[in-house]
Regions:
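Glycine-focused motif/segment detector
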Residues: 1-335
Length: 335
């Protein structure tokens, strides 16, 4: 490494010098070193080292770890120069995020994160953002069907994070509930006077209730999966009037009414509470076992998990450790 041509790289191409001194595990630097010593064009040496030429614009402070594979498409090269960090302190993380987002999603997403990280230097939930961005461009995929607001390059980072979190909430609902109706609702549908109690026992019913009643019952999927909650819709004269949650309350071993609320979470009238209690007590409560599951121990739905992620695995030609083949609550929560 003590050749004058190599030393010249400190000024002409710091990234290449760093890559030769601290190569990636999958790159043998000897061919690139030979190119430099022989006076070959820098483009040839960079290609041998697996580096894009646009890295010439970055100073030595940008490199603190082996340089990961980076995007190098023609459009990317034209755009990335507009989003280079001015602060040397931001450069190592910025470079890592550009590489990561290109691998997670695509080059357009890498340009986007290069820009947005400079506006708002946040780097959490990159796996989630990358998945949401990738599925945003995959019409026909189940993962795309669950996206309410798809990614566009014009989005700000905070708006993208909000949309990605909403997508994760939708995917969580499907992973927790699965594709089949909930088998044990604990109670039976019934009628008391003019009021009818209908089970919210599958995803379409829960989502429809959330939309019509303007409430957040579609976020109750964790409680449902762990047998801590069941949801019911209360109707009168052919219209929804309230949403009812049943479960165990405090130290009471018998099934109880946990919540009863009208449209928009309005307080239910006293009369409706009495009707709901009468319906509840039509059942043999001491004989009902909810089968509560220890928190975070309920399995996610295997068929839904693989239906959701299979297109991504195939497109990327790998199953990453952070998105395993077997359903994992820990892996999903870490996104």
């Amino acid at each position: 490494m003590r050749h004058p041509h190599l030393a010249d790289l400190a000024l002409s191409f710091p990234a290449l010098l760093f890559a030769l001194a601290v190569p990636r595990p999958d790159v043998d630097p000897e061919r690139a070193i030979a190119c430099v010593i022989a006076g070959r064009p820098l483009a040839e040496a960079a290609a041998a080292a697996g580096l894009p030429l646009w890295l010439r614009k970055l100073p030595p402070e940008a490199f603190v770890r082996p340089i990961p594979p980076l995007p190098n498409g023609e459009l990317f090269r034209r755009q990335i120069g507009n989003h280079l960090p001015r602060s040397p302190k931001l450069m190592p993380t910025w470079l890592q995020l550009v590489a990561e987002m290109a691998a997670l999603a695509h080059e357009a997403a890498a340009v986007w994160i290069a820009r947005e990280y400079l506006r708002a230097p946040k780097r959490d939930h990159m796996h989630l953002l990358g998945l949401w961005i990738w599925f945003s461009g995959q019409p026909g995929c189940f993962g795309r069907e669950l996206i309410e607001r798809p990614w566009t390059p014009a989005m700000k980072l905070d708006a993208a994070r909000t949309a990605a979190f909403a997508w994760r909430a939708n995917t969580t609902l499907h992973l927790n509930i699965g594709q089949r109706p909930i088998r044990n609702m604990w109670l039976n549908p019934g009628r008391v006077g003019d009021y009818e109690f209908r089970p919210l026992d599958d995803i379409p019913a829960i989502v429809e209730e959330a939309v019509v009643m303007r409430n957040c019952v579609r976020t109750y999927d964790d409680d449902i999966a762990h047998n801590r909650s069941r949801l019911w819709s209360v109707w009168r004269n052919g219209e929804r009037v309230a949403t009812l949650e049943t479960g165990l309350h405090c130290h009471d071993p018998l099934l109880n009414i946990v919540q009863l609320e009208g449209p928009g979470n309005a307080a239910a009238p006293r009369e409706l509470w009495w009707i709901a209690r009468r319906w509840l007590h039509l059942h043999d409560l001491p004989q009902i076992e909810t089968g509560r599951i220890k928190w975070r121990q309920a399995p996610l739905d295997l068929a839904t998990w693989r239906r959701l992620w299979r297109p991504y695995w195939l497109a990327k030609r790998r199953i990453p450790d952070w998105l395993p083949l077997a359903p994992s609550r820990a892996a999903f929560a870490a996104l």
